[in-house]
Amino acid sequence: MTFDSSGEVPVTFAQGVLNDVGEITAISPGDNPERAAEVKALKHRIAELLVECKANPFVGELMGPGLHPELATCRRVRFDIPSQKGKPRFRLIYRNEPSDGAPSECLWLTIAPRAGLRAHRKAQQRSRL
């Protein structure tokens, strides 16, 4: 187990995760001010998740066997911005390494929309690499 001096677990990103963040937080020149405010809140929420995972790599719920057995040891966080009503629209899927015992690394596999199981598909692809 290798914690840094602050007692936090390092968070690393699978290839493509930063692109995921860019996709869901992109603003077009024609977007209205409400969209810009939503994107700002979403960026803030993602930053909070990073801090939460560093402090507690078990913050997400264990996925377990189910529709995606290859993600059984992964964890997921359902999240959205505070003003959004209804089901959270986004998922963070990550894996603690090693998966048993005290993790030395929190590997984010994806941050993507819930719709169409996009987050799960991306995590599946990246977990094989």
Locate predicted features.
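Enriched for short, Lys/Arg-rich terminal
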Residues: 1-8, 72, 78-129
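Arg/Lys-rich, positively charged N-terminal/basic patches that mediate binding to nucleic acids
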Residues: 1-51
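A short acidic, often aromatic-flanked loop/helix-cap motif at beta-alpha or helix-coil junctions
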Residues: 18-21, 68-70, 116-117
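Generic, well-ordered alpha-helical segments
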Residues: 34, 38-41, 55, 69, ...
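A short, surface-exposed loop/turn module that caps and links secondary-structure elements
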Residues: 51-84
